[in-house]
């Protein structure tokens, strides 16, 4: 296996893991970075693998919590509510994704759309942060979330179907806008990523499994492990960060990155295939 290809697969896995749980759009970063370093492996299969690696980082980080929930379902009220909230939050985006997946990829998966959503999302984060700084959040614990709170976060997640919006960005900001404390909204976003990304991965596997070849196994494993490790680091770091600070730095980053995408696209440095 060529060392340069291995290095590129490693870098792509790291990009996925570090950006998946930050409100900065992992999709945009993977496309731009993949173009810049010339990574042209079996794209969709590789993407599925690194997304799975990233989501398993959340499962590992919260393994005790998920274990308690699994053992408590049907017996423990707190576990039942947790599962119910995840199910409620999961449904809106899952339904809309199944209904409009083809149209979204056909009409919205382009550099202009992604760049615009990055910039608009950046300004939206600035507005939400300014709003929360003026009002005391009503909910400061994941276990205190009600089904209606989960539904509002789920509705917000629908916007993440538009490339460039960011799943974590839409769910966290949607939660904060609804009156949920920043760290609590972030944690619930992590939890919601598990069923959402597992379902998306399963859907993509059914669509693209025929493109898998044994030749890709090595690169897939490298990307998977890199995404898992970097995702674990990102989850820990983000929780620590939002415990003391806000999301404003990410807002400015999004705005700049959106402009960079337009420049790179117009200059021919990146393609969108």
Swiss-Prot record:
Keywords: Antibiotic resistance, Cell inner membrane, Cell membrane, Cell shape, Cell wall biogenesis/degradation, Hydrolase, Membrane, Peptidoglycan synthesis, Transmembrane, Transmembrane helix
Pfam family, one: BacA
Transmembrane residue ranges: 13-35, 45-62, 82-102, 108-128, 186-206, 219-239, 250-270
Note: Bacitracin is thought to be involved in the inhibition of peptidoglycan synthesis by sequestering undecaprenyl diphosphate, thereby reducing the pool of lipid carrier available.
Reactions mediated catalytically: di-trans,octa-cis-undecaprenyl diphosphate + H2O = di-trans,octa-cis-undecaprenyl phosphate + phosphate + H(+)
Lineage of producing organism: Bacteria, Pseudomonadati, Pseudomonadota, Betaproteobacteria, Neisseriales
EC numbers for this chain: 3.6.1.27
Location(s) in or outside the cell: Cell inner membrane
Function: Catalyzes the dephosphorylation of undecaprenyl diphosphate (UPP). Confers resistance to bacitracin.
Membrane topology: Multi-pass membrane protein
PANTHER family: UNDECAPRENYL-DIPHOSPHATASE
Species of provenance: Neisseria gonorrhoeae (strain ATCC 700825 / FA 1090)
Annotated family: Belongs to the UppP family.
Major site of localization recorded for this protein: membrane
Molecular function GO terms recorded: undecaprenyl-diphosphatase activity
GO cellular component: plasma membrane
One BP term from GO: response to antibiotic
InterPro entries reported for this sequence: UppP
Name of the featured protein: Undecaprenyl-diphosphatase
């Amino acid at each position: 296996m060529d060392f340069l290809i291995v290095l590129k697969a490693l870098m792509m896995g790291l990009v996925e893991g570090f950006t998946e749980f930050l409100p900065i759009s992992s999709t945009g970063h993977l496309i731009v970075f993949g173009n810049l370093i010339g990574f042209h492996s079996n794209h969709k299969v590789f993407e599925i693998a690194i997304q799975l690696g990233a989501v398993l980082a959340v499962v590992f980080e919260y393994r005790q919590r998920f274990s308690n929930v699994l053992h408590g379902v049907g017996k423990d009220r707190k576990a039942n509510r947790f599962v119910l909230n995840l199910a409620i939050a999961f449904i809106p985006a899952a339904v809309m994704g199944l209904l409009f997946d083809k149209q979204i990829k056909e009409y919205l998966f382009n550099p202009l759309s992604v760049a615009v959503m990055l910039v608009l999302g950046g300004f939206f984060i600035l507005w939400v942060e300014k709003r929360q700084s003026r009002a005391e959040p009503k909910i400061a614990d994941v276990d205190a979330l009600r089904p209606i709170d989960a539904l509002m976060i789920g509705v917000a997640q629908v916007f993440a179907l538009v490339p460039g919006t960011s799943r974590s960005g839409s769910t966290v900001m949607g939660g904060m806008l609804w009156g949920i404390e920043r760290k609590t909204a972030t944690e619930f976003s992590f939890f919601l990523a598990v069923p959402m990304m597992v379902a998306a991965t399963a859907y993509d596997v059914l669509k693209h499994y025929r493109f898998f070849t044994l030749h890709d196994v090595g690169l897939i494993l490298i990307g998977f492990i890199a995404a898992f490790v970097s995702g674990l680091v990102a989850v820990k770091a983000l929780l620590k960060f939002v415990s003391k600070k806000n999301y404003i730095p990410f807002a400015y980053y999004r705005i700049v990155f959106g402009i960079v995408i337009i420049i790179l696209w117009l200059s021919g440095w990146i393609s969108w295939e």
